[in-house]
Swiss-Prot record:
SUPFAM superfamilies: Ferredoxin reductase-like, C-terminal NADP-linked domain, Riboflavin synthase domain-like. Its cofactor is FAD. One of its GO terms (molecular function) is cytochrome-b5 reductase activity, acting on NAD(P)H. It is a single-pass membrane protein. GO terms for biological process: ergosterol biosynthetic process. It comes from Ajellomyces capsulatus (strain NAm1 / WU24). GO terms for cellular component: mitochondrial outer membrane. This is NADH-cytochrome b5 reductase 2. It catalyses: 2 Fe(III)-[cytochrome b5] + NADH = 2 Fe(II)-[cytochrome b5] + NAD(+) + H(+). Belongs to the flavoprotein pyridine nucleotide cytochrome reductase family. Residues 70-178 form the FAD-binding FR-type domain. The gene is MCR1. Keywords: FAD, Flavoprotein, Membrane, Mitochondrion, Mitochondrion outer membrane, NAD, Oxidoreductase, Transmembrane, Transmembrane helix.
Length: 324
């Protein structure tokens, strides 16, 4: 469980945050972010994005996941990357190497397995981190999976060997993203709740016509647990007027300059735009305790439930918040 903390912004940082929050979105760089970003063992790695001028229009591809009554599809595990002490990136192959997943941005898939002694199968949703949409990854999908001590699916996935198969079903649609629909979006994530946020961020900055500004607040236990950090740092350097990331850790290292412990009201009040000053949308994804503190729980996948917690206390409306 996260410890509480007090986030004290130095005056220069506070001024920087206010300036960033009030600036109009700058014109997008002519170097959009295209292509899948992948993680490697420990240190991680990623593909650099290429210019759209170097890309020809994508041709029509067959899709693997069509939804409806399609049923479960078994995919073979093709590659495993050990990202850190409790996270792996798993690549699953499609039968047709030229096919695409068919998922929309930030949508998820159901996974299923049944052990030899299990009475019923274990089913869990996961959001892939492979590229989706127009420039979708061909022939595979990638999952970023954190092992939880009492998580039957995460433990099964971590114990899988290359060549074994896993059942998938989907897609499960989430938020229908529209370019520049919002002036500013705020992503509040904990742990592997970063995966749908990453899909949104990559979609926004791969489209030169999308002018959306993005603020990320990301909570983890240790610095090693910050997934996709290199990719987010690259975005901050490339789009300093449109993307900012703030991190908070339960067990920070010495000389850690950012937040310590759980995401608090003080932190969000400091780094998020005021609810009535901009056309904003806030997205939340993380463990149940985080939902309870920040926004309140969803009632069901189709029912967002009422807004409560810190975001309500700060004056945001139910319509301004989406819970993954």
């Amino acid at each position: 469980m996260f410890a509480r903390y007090t986030f004290r912004c130095s005056q220069p940082l506070a001024q920087s945050v206010r300036k960033y929050s009030s600036e109009a979105p700058a014109k997008s760089s002519r170097i959009p972010l295209i292509g899948g970003i992948t993680l490697a063992a420990g240190a991680g790695y990623y593909y650099y994005w290429q210019t759209t001028s170097a890309k020809s229009e994508p041709k029509e591809r067959s899709t693997v996941f069509k939804g409806g009554d399609q049923g479960w599809i078994g995919l073979k595990l093709a590659h495993i990357d050990n990202v850190n002490h409790n996270v792996k990136k798993l690549r699953f192959e499609f039968e047709d190497p030229e096919s695409v997943s068919g998922l929309h941005i930030a949508s998820a898939l159901l996974t299923k397995y049944k052990g030899l002694t299990d009475e019923k199968p274990t089913i869990r949703p996961y959001t892939p981190v492979s590229d989706e949409g127009m420039w979708a990854s061909l022939g595979y999908l990638d999952l970023l999976v954190k092992r939880y001590p009492n998580g039957p699916m995460s433990n099964h996935l971590h114990n899988m060997a290359v060549g074994q198969r896993l059942d998938f079903k989907g897609p499960l649609p989430k938020y229908p993203w529209e370019p520049s629909k919002h002036d500013h979006i705020c992503l509040i994530a904990g742990g592997t709740g970063i995966t749908p946020m990453y899909q949104l961020v990559r979609k926004i900055f791969s489209n030169p016509e999308d002018k959306t500004k993005v603020t990320l607040v990301f909570a983890n236990v240790t610095e090693e647990d910050i997934l996709l950090r290199k990719e987010f740092e690259h975005l901050e350097n490339t789009y300093p007027r449109r993307f900012r990331a703030f991190y908070t850790l339960d067990k920070p290292p010495k000389n850690w300059a950012q937040g310590t412990g759980f995401i608090t009201k003080d932190l969000l009040k400091t780094v998020l735009p005021e609810p009535k000053t901009e056309n904003i949308k806030i997205f939340v994804c993380g463990p149940p305790a985080m939902y309870k503190a920040i926004s309140g729980q969803k009632v069901s996948p189709k029912d967002q439930g009422e807004l409560s917690g810190i975001l309500k206390e700060l004056g945001y409306s139910k319509e301004q918040v989406y819970k993954f």
